[in-house]
UniProtKB/Swiss-Prot annotation:
A molecular-function term among this protein's GO annotations: DNA binding
UniProt protein name: Nucleoid-associated protein BcerKBAB4_0019
Oligomer status and interactors: Homodimer.
Entry similarity comment: Belongs to the YbaB/EbfC family.
Keywords: Cytoplasm, DNA-binding
Function: Binds to DNA and alters its conformation. May be involved in regulation of gene expression, nucleoid organization and DNA protection.
Annotated PANTHER family: NUCLEOID-ASSOCIATED PROTEIN YBAB
GO cellular component assignments: bacterial nucleoid; cytosol
Chief place of localization: cytoplasm
């Protein structure tokens, strides 16, 4: 009776180790992906990695108005938030397959 229980436990441990390995690989692949957030009809673009690092900010020359720096700041902020939202969506779709049915708090895949 105990032997069967130990065999099941070993199988469960192997499955957990495989899942951890698969999750680590998916997390690594996520970091290699990029998303693009935009604002102002593409006047400001922010590129971020799958690990939520802003990699690049592009600002079209025609949006730069020394008399209205606040508008430019708002566009950069909006583009950054758009990029980070897309990273969350990418993360949820990539990592969510590992956490289905676990009832983790929001934002945790």
């Amino acid at each position: 009776m105990m032997r069967g229980g130990m065999g099941n436990m070993n199988n469960m441990m192997k499955q957990m180790q495989k899942m951890q390995k698969d999750m680590a690989k998916a997390q690594e692949e996520l970091g290699e992906k990029t998303v693009e957030g935009t604002a102002g009809g593409g006047m400001v673009t922010v590129i971020a990695s799958g690990h939520k690092q802003v990699l690049e900010v592009k600002i079209k020359e025609e949006v730069v108005d020394p008399e209205d720096i606040e508008m430019l700041q708002d566009l950069v902020l909006a583009a950054t938030n758009d990029a980070l939202k897309k990273v969350d969506e990418l993360s949820n779709s990539t990592m969510g397959k590992f956490t289905k049915g676990m009832n983790l708090p929001g934002g945790m895949f």
